[in-house]
Curated annotation (Swiss-Prot):
It comes from Homo sapiens (Human). Keywords: Membrane, Mitochondrion, Mitochondrion inner membrane, Protein transport, Transit peptide, Translocation, Transmembrane, Transmembrane helix, Transport. This is Mitochondrial import inner membrane translocase subunit Tim29. Residues 78-260 are mitochondrial intermembrane. InterPro entries: TIMM29. The gene is TIMM29.
Amino acid sequence: MAAAALRRFWSRRRAEAGDAVVAKPGVWARLGSWARALLRDYAEACRDASAEARARPGRAAVYVGLLGGAAACFTLAPSEGAFEEALLEASGTLLLLAPATRNRESEAFVQRLLWLRGRGRLRYVNLGLCSLVYEAPFDAQASLYQARCRYLQPRWTDFPGRVLDVGFVGRWWVLGAWMRDCDINDDEFLHLPAHLRVVGPQQLHSETNERLFDEKYKPVVLTDDQVDQALWEEQVLQKEKKDRLALSQAHSLVQAEAPR
């Protein structure tokens, strides 16, 4: 009787275990359930965001604008090749200028960048929204102890002083600022009085000068009165010239006959 009870208990446990094995879902079923739950959560989040945007359109527009601006900045962040092109273009621009007309500060900044570039001490880093070019103490391939020891590396507190240029929305702003007046040499105006060394915006007449320069090549159009006046003046000048010639001839004849 005890043996029969044990057999019944054992058979019942095996049946329950078999039902549990059959009822347990597989890997793909669990992945499908997880994907459906994830999509359901995202759908609810999108519905909530849409409802919030309809309730507060101003805030939604600000968020969309910020996201769009961040995406544009991320896309337009200049690359290392863009900095190389800008540096070579700036160097070529200075070479086309006469040494006496080059801005000393612009030339010194570009020469420093070229010097660091030639020694492999320029570093480029992309921060997503913008790019940075900074100065390194050694070449990346240098094997010196000072270059490899991590205890001798520059401090992060000194990093702002080593930044050379900032790239944002497709431009390198520091290099562009130095090259803005690259063809103006302030040393040329040191001999001038103090009030003539600085020119204000109201004192510039470049547009007027350019217009007058172009007008000097245009044909002169004269009216009939101006033509008559010019002809009369020409006749008067010719008459005066003839009179002076006659007087000079008479004077020479008088001087020739005087000794006789």
